[in-house]
Amino acid sequence: MKRKTAVKWLAVLAGAGLLYWGNKTYLNVSPKEIRVWVLSFGVFAPLMFIGISIVRPLVLFPVSVISIAGGLAFGPLLGTLYTLFGSMCASAVSFFAAGLFSAKKNGHYERLEAIQKQMEDNGFFYIFLLRILPINFDFVSYAAGLSNVKALPYFAATAVGIIPGTIALNVLGASFLAGNLPAFFMVLALYIVFISLPFIFRKKMQNLFQESN
């Protein structure tokens, strides 16, 4: 790795570390606190919620907290719809920001080369699996932005892949307020399906890894 590239990545890591520290120190808020703040905007609450969802990846704020807050603030149906829309916008921000920063057409980055190759070779299916797996949402978005993966399969895979987790977290958030036991078991069932999918597609995943080696 060239010295200039190494310095750039050290700066990125330092910036990420600073953002993480600031997040934990100043943005360590709960879903209930987000709910109260968002609903204070009245009829503009949905717009504010979508707005913070869009800027969230820029400050490395956990997507799970936002998703639960969506269920708390708007209920399982509207909360899920607003969270899905906000998450798609956030994934676009991360994807294009990473692409602009890295000048992605000029090559690969050693640390991410295996993931980049998988994304480029297998497109929709690989990104879909990464979205299904309990992997950091923004890591997948930034990794895709650093690769040569096309925008259409990236967004299509993201839209489909985030549905199970988004529904589960929003229903969980809504059940906190309602004290709804059936909703809790519904979330539990969704999570069982959610974590089982990688095992169901295990053979396909192994084939993908073998093809890239």
Curated annotation (Swiss-Prot):
TM spans (from-to): 9-29, 34-54, 58-78, 81-101, 159-179, 181-201
Record's subcellular location: Cell membrane
Keyword Transmembrane helix included in the entry's annotation: yes
Membrane topology: Multi-pass membrane protein
Highest taxon of the lineage: Bacteria
Keyword terms of this UniProt record: Cell membrane, Membrane, Transmembrane, Transmembrane helix
Annotated family: Belongs to the TVP38/TMEM64 family.
Full protein name: TVP38/TMEM64 family membrane protein YtxB
